[in-house]
């Protein structure tokens, strides 16, 4: 039955893809599905994008709004303990959306009042207020970054890799619409108020549609899939990205036994005896019995502090880690299988040029970047893998951060010349650009 439902959902989107109107499939959808789970939506998109049906990622992006409208009145909710706690990621996510929607309402009121206002002094103040409110709405980018960098990697681990790809593409479209709306608003009074309203509504329509998709589809997938530990990981890593308009009023700390305590309560009791033997008490329906045995020696864990041959000298794992974390640059390593395997920890996450968090480790490098950059990522990886280039360099000036960022992507080869992966190192070279002397010892 589940397969049939997924196939029907697939057929509906294929019909829309081939030109059918939403109205023509709405009745069939309503008649077939009394309620549809977010997991089925995810499976459907995954099947469409990974089958020979001819539907591509771009096609699903085009269908995204129609898809959302079809499910607007048919998505089943999922209740999970603690999601209404002020610090739970779900509550934080919804509170941000509420604050962002309130800012949209204020902007609409400002634009309507501006249109009928004749007092030039008041108009000037309203223009300042409009830019301030647009700045508040612009914080949605932080909300999107947390979604893309913290939620999406965990979704992919559970096999839901298609929804993140589609939603990230739409997020980027919304970002573009906002930049256009902001630039037009800042151009008042040279730009007409009608142009400002038009560009703002083009953004707001898509933005409000995304809020629906987040709360009625995305969060449902997360609530059905994520464990309590997944949510805790998101809580721990969220501060690195920040929050939109409002911050959590308190930290979410779930009430539960630790998994270690639960596990130990279920395991048989072990008692140490003389001469290295162990007695184990085992419960059975008929009663308890005790066995005595000598455990095998376990292989010792890697000693992080013991010296190992390392390049032209000796280092412990701990020393190597400290050295990498003290380098004045951000380092990322992607292995030969295109898996993001490592990044160093030389600066607080919220100060990183390119933010990295533990949840991203183990992710395919193509999924670590917005869809709009996918072709560039593939070009770099292919060029370094095939040896057409040893490294790629790029740089840009970030006025907002006061940094001049230099990036290098270098191929990593072993002693036999075999490709082992790509090393990315990123540094702020602005301090070096400001050097204006030929000589300096730094000892004074």
What are these regions (language model features)?
Residues 1-141, 145-392, 396, 403-405, ...:
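Small-residue-biased structural context
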